[in-house]
Amino acid sequence: MEIQVVNHPLVASRLSIMRDKNSDNAQFRAALSDLGAMLIYEASADLVVEHFELETPVATTTGTRLEKPPIIVPVIRAGLGMIDPALSMIPDAQVGFIGMARDETTHEPVPYLEALPDDLSDQPVFLVDPMLATGGSLLHAIRLLEGRGANDITCVCMVSAQPGVDALVEANVGVRRLYTATIDPSLNKEAYIVPGLGDAGDRLYGPRNIDL
């Protein structure tokens, strides 16, 4: 698996806003939107393109477009915040959904939604989730995608923890690339990323009020 930590001043500045505990929901959402677009831009660099003839106002030239736009699959709830940034970069992408919440006692993922095409074989997939902590939720999502034939999966996570990255590598699943803004060193006893940015879903939308 190829791991790309995107090192850029604008990426670092938006990540800093998201990390700051004093950033309110609106500031956090705005920074996440900007950062999401930047990471999707970077993750798209290896997508296959095709060329076609087009007319400008003054001449004929060759244009470029994606041969097969990826399907964007957010792990919701927090991944919902990455849909609009992804579509701003790739407006003709399809969107699927995988819903998972975290059991706050066991720290294990609890799936509650799967809305995906039946056949994902030979279809580029961008699996997006702001946080890669233990890797449990992402690995569960990856196995769901693989069960539908996905063999070209790119994970886009804003903040990744080293234990989660290690779990992804050791699981030997069909992920070709991981794009992230940072790899933080550790998790605390509640399985939150340290230094991290807290609970991305809560900071986007407010506290979750559904009992699992």
Curated annotation (Swiss-Prot):
Keyword terms, alphabetized: Allosteric enzyme, Glycosyltransferase, GTP-binding, Magnesium, Nucleotide-binding, Transferase
Gene3D superfamilies hit by this protein: 3.40.50.2020
InterPro entries, sorted: PRibTrfase_dom, PRTase-like, Upp_B, UPRTase/APRTase, Ura_phspho_trans
Binding site for uracil: I193, G198, D199, A200
A single GO molecular function term of this UniProt record: magnesium ion binding
Cofactor detail note: Binds 1 Mg(2+) ion per subunit. The magnesium is bound as Mg-PRPP.
Cofactor: Mg(2+)
Involved pathway(s): Pyrimidine metabolism; UMP biosynthesis via salvage pathway; UMP from uracil: step 1/1
GO biological process entries: UMP salvage; uracil salvage
Annotated residues for binding of 5-phospho-alpha-D-ribose 1-diphosphate: R77, R102, D129, P130, M131, L132, A133, T134, G135, G136, S137, D199
Regulation: Allosterically activated by GTP.
Broad class of enzyme this protein falls into: transferase
Catalytic activity of the protein: UMP + diphosphate = 5-phospho-alpha-D-ribose 1-diphosphate + uracil
Annotated EC: 2.4.2.9
Function recorded in the entry: Catalyzes the conversion of uracil and 5-phospho-alpha-D-ribose 1-diphosphate (PRPP) to UMP and diphosphate.
Family assignment from sequence similarity: Belongs to the UPRTase family.
The protein's name: Uracil phosphoribosyltransferase
Species in which this protein is naturally found: Corynebacterium jeikeium (strain K411)
